[in-house]
Amino acid sequence: MHPLLILAFVGAAVAFPSDDDDKIVGGYTCAENSVPYQVSLNAGYHFCGGSLINDQWVVSAAHCYQYHIQVRLGEYNIDVLEGGEQFIDASKIIRHPKYSSWTLDNDILLIKLSTPAVINARVSTLLLPSACASAGTECLISGWGNTLSSGVNYPDLLQCLVAPLLSHADCEASYPGQITNNMICAGFLEGGKDSCQGDSGGPVACNGQLQGIVSWGYGCAQKGKPGVYTKVCNYVDWIQETIAANS
C-alpha cells in the first residue's frame, strides 16, 4: 500500500475500505491500441492510471500523488516490453489546491512530462470536455486494476468497461452526505461491474472526451455502491490555467 493512498482512504475509512480504488471488475480485455490516451503511473511498479491530454500533460487523481512519478505511455501489457512504449519522467506534479484527502473532493492532479510525448498509433490524446455529460451517457473506463470484487487479480493486459453515468440523485442516494458537486457516479446499481484498486486516476471517456477520473468507492462492484469519479468538466478552466502558468 502506498503512504499517500493510505492517507486518502484512512481519511474516509467508512467509504474507502481498500487502499486505492483503481481496478476494473466485470469488464473485458481492451483491444490493443484502442485506448491510446491511457497511461500508467509508475514508481518502480504500476500504482495508478492517467490520461494524456496533450503531448506534455497528463491528468490523474490527486490521491495518486507521489514525489517521483514515471509516466508510461503506449502500454498494453504492463508486464513486458512490447516495443513502442514511451517512459517519461514527470517534471512537475500539481495537485488541485483545494484537494481534500478527507473527503476526496477536488481529486485531480496534473503531471507535466519532462519531454513531450511522441504522438502515434499507440500514444495519443483525449479531449477535455466541452460540456458536462448527462446521466445515461455511455462511457469507457479503463485500467490495470484488480479484476475481482473479492480477492486479488491484477491483470497484465489493459482492461475496459463500458458503463453509464448515473444521475446526481442516484449518486447521492448511494453515498449519503459524501458526494460533492465535483463528483459523478458511473456504473451499475445492481453491482457486478466497476473500477477498483489499481485503476485510480484513470479515464472515464465519454464520446471522445475526458469526463471522469477514477477516484473512490465502497469496495468494488458492490450492489448499490457504484464507482465515484472526479467530475472533470468542473476543472477545465483550472487545467487550462495551470498548463498556461507552467508552460
Curated annotation (Swiss-Prot):
GO molecular function terms attached to this record: calcium ion binding; serine-type endopeptidase activity
Binding site for Ca(2+): 75, 77, 80, 85
Propeptide residue range(s): 16-23
Signal peptide: 1-15
One GO CC term on file: extracellular space
Name of a matching Pfam family: Trypsin
Post-translational modification: Not sulfated on tyrosine residue(s).
Catalytic-site annotation from UniProt: 63, 107, 200
Segments forming domain Peptidase S1: 24-244
Compartments (UniProt record): Secreted, Extracellular space
UniProt superkingdom: Eukaryota
PANTHER family: TRYPSIN-2 (PTHR24264:SF57), TRYPSIN-RELATED (PTHR24264)
Family: Belongs to the peptidase S1 family.
The name this protein goes by in its record: Anionic trypsin
Source species taxonomy: Eukaryota, Metazoa, Chordata, Craniata, Vertebrata
